[in-house]
Amino acid sequence: MALPMVLYDHYGSLQQGELTGRIVILTHGLCMNHLSWSNSRYGGIGERLLAQRDNNTMLYLNYNTGRRISANGRSFANVLEDLVQRNPRITSIDLIGHSMGGLVSRSALFYGKQNLYQWVHMVENLVCIGSPHHGAALERFGFILQDKLGAFPFISLIGQLINIRSNGIL
């Protein structure tokens, strides 16, 4: 079952109503969701940012981490363009992404620029927290292991099993 890409407000409701001024969009990492930003186990960064906001609107992106980063980035770019079109009084955008969320945000900027989207010029900050911009070690290990096991016909089945992994980390 595919999860739709959705923006939530800080209170966990679907984003509705008019937005003005600066908006801050937090994008979660692999195998997480929009609620992770407020979880005290992860430092409660969403709560702390909310307490320090000066008339900023905090939004939380929820997306399917099983999709490829490029597909999520393209969808996120479209979501942002729709958001700005529906809310012409937005003045600036900050994107904060954790791990895979930083990669998805960066990908959204790429596709936003490619499509000449209006929102790209509103982005003032892109903050990536622990994002593997040079690739994830786990994924590199998976490719190496798959390659080595594939060389032995009698254990190539194990190599095929290793190849079954989320598109989000390919």
Regions found by a protein language model. Name each.
Residues 30-32, 65-66, 102, 110, ...:
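Short, solvent-exposed loop/turn segments at secondary-structure junctions
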Residues 42-47, 76-83, 105-114:
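Short, well-ordered amphipathic alpha-helices
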Residues 96-97, 101-105, 130:
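Gly/Ala-rich beta-loop-alpha elbow adjacent to hydrolase catalytic centers
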Residues 110-170:
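Helical cap/lid subdomain of alpha/beta-hydrolase-fold lipid enzymes
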